[in-house]
């Protein structure tokens, strides 16, 4: 009898949770509820930022996990572009069909410090070989974050011209 009561309670709780999430999803999709929480002022990109990266993680919520807790090699200057407030973070984490797909979402400006070093005229041809792409920056960040933290981060990087003021990619249709 005891196991029957506890499993019955579990099933009722699970059913209530399922109904609640379905109703909340329907309310958001129908436009009755809007989950737009902007907790920080829009920051201007640093002068030398050429890239913007979106980092999603199921375990690391704070931007410091990706800025001050990681030393990037080769040298990258990573600064926060946008971070969601606590309510939006929990929504992204708990609701798998949210924009975050069950993960905390943070965005960052990234400057490649080595590309900013002034070069002599003799270096001009060689400097083109050292120009990194957004995919190169993603690979560097992925290697450094996953070896120095336990964040298990999913990273996407874009050229700075291809993102909005929250460093999220803009669609080509806009």
UniProtKB/Swiss-Prot annotation:
Induction (UniProt): Expression is highly induced in filaments that grow at the water-air interface when repellent gene rep1 is absent.
Subcellular location: Secreted
Transmembrane segments: none
Keywords: Glycoprotein, Secreted, Signal
Glycosylation sites: 77
Signal peptide feature range: 1-26
Subunit note: Secreted cysteine-rich proteins (SCRPs) are predicted to form amyloids.
Task of the protein: Secreted cysteine-rich protein that might form amyloid strutures which are involved in attachment to hydrophobic surfaces and in formation of hydrophobic aerial hyphae.
Full protein name: Secreted cysteine-rich protein UMAG_00792
